[in-house]
Amino acid sequence: MSTEGGMSFLSEQDRMNESEKDDHDFLFFNPLAQPFSKWYELHKRLNLFPWWIRYNLGSAKEANLKDRILEVGKNLGLSTIWMNKIIRHSISEFSKKGLGFDYYGYHNIYHELEATYFTLLAASGQNKDNNFDLKDIKYLFLSALFHDYDPLKSFDKPNEDEVEWFIRKDKKIREWIEEEGLNIDIMMAMIHRTAYPFRGKIASGAIERMNHLFSKAGIPMEDEKTRKYYHDLGWFLSVSERVAGYALGNFDRAIELARLNAHGLGWHPSLINQESVKYFSVLKQEKEMLDRILNSVSEKYKQNFLENISKFKEAWIQEVEIKRSLRKNEISLIPVIEDKNVKIDPKIVNSIIDIRNDLNGPLLVNNKQDFAKSLSHPDTILVTLRVKEKDTMVIGFAKGGPLEQYRLRRGTNDANHGKKNTVFLESMYIRSGYWGEKGGHLLRLYFLTRSKELGYEYVTGYVHRDVLLRRSDKGEPIQLVQKYDPDKLDYYRIELNRFNYDPLF
């Protein structure tokens, strides 16, 4: 038996011996996959109760997506009752294990629902030469809905081996597979085909596992046609789930997805446009399947996808030009601590609100209306980042205030709450194109300086763990107060009287 990355795998001979056992036996086990505490799941259920009310009333966006899945699935011949109970189970399991609507990562339950809806849409538009039968549709439905089911993952990106472990361990999923006459090994082989990027060691490992699963499913090695058929069905799923979010939404949604993906991978914000262009370039290498899928959905979704690609390219070109201007000193950035005793120029206020409105996701601690009002609150600390040559041109800002005025993320308890000695830094926002040129460093430095001047002892907030560790390694007096896995959006605290205010720090 070989061991790799904390996982124990059976040898090939052991696998062959195991193939005679019941389909529900595991071919490998994950020693880290301990059951979630009942108290943890109860806590999640209680916290999610208001959302469940909205979901059951149909006002949550997940409920709308569920209804669209049921509609297209019914048209393809799937039982509404069967789909409904499986979707409900998936939402419940993802949510109570921390991967629900409040999870700050790309691979959350909404992505699973988007992937399922788009995959079924693409399947419904296949021509006669590529038509799927009802069993194929059932495989696609289940595989799309659970292809990222890895609640104990260490990173945002799931591990297909662990996904298989959790699916095989889930009694309800196994029963739904069996009652429809499906084979769990074929379903798992399709999910392994979603491994990304599908090249090099990742592809060879997935193919090896898929071949074993095909053998276990009773498909002999000689039956290359059937194996290729299910391999391609998994490929169809893989491309569909990667295209889904970028085809179903506009560029605002595409940017949100890119930011979530960047956060999960620990990228600096300055890499978002560049890496997004690379992502779509790699996808175009699968042109055969990509064209097949895009030609199977409505013109609206196809155009959404193509326009989003084009806009990412435009944003990257613009970003390159901005960086060139900054490095040639044609333009320069200056931070400004806004005086709360002086009314802010309406143009500056509008610029700040525009930057804020471009953002989405659970990092935003106020809604748009409350945010606008908070800019003029006497306790607000606001630092703007401007283009020196155009004084009123704001391209970023850092904003915060007394800790007591904020609701923290579930699970965060700050011992300083009520002591009025702590400032909460909401976040730092910079327009696309200006990241990576020390603007964020200047905003943060001036925000910390202003907080110290006002008599505060600490600054807290949420930041990706990799960023926090890098700052700690540089000697910053920064403390990790509350960890959050797998999204790694951790709560930190900085002790201001120990902070180095050297601008080059």
Identify the function of each model-found stretch.
Residues 115, 135-153, 163, 188-195:
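His-Asp-centered metal-binding catalytic motifs of divalent-metal-dependent phosphohydrolases/nucleases
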Residues 327-370, 384-386, 393:
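Short amphipathic alpha-helix that is part of the acyltransferase structural core
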Residues 427-430, 436-449:
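Conserved acetyl-CoA-binding loop-helix of GNAT-fold acetyltransferases
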Residues 9-74, 106, 118-134, 146, ...:
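Divalent metal-dependent phosphate-bond-processing catalytic cores, especially two-metal-ion Mg2+/Mn2+ enzymes
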Residues 112, 119, 160-216:
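Histidine- and acidic-residue-rich, metal-dependent catalytic cores
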Residues 88-116, 150:
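Active-site flanking loop/helix segments enriched in acidic
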Residues 390-427:
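Conserved acyl-donor/pantetheine-binding loop and adjacent beta-alpha core of acyl/acetyltransferases
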Residues 451-465:
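Conserved GNAT acetyl-CoA-binding A-motif
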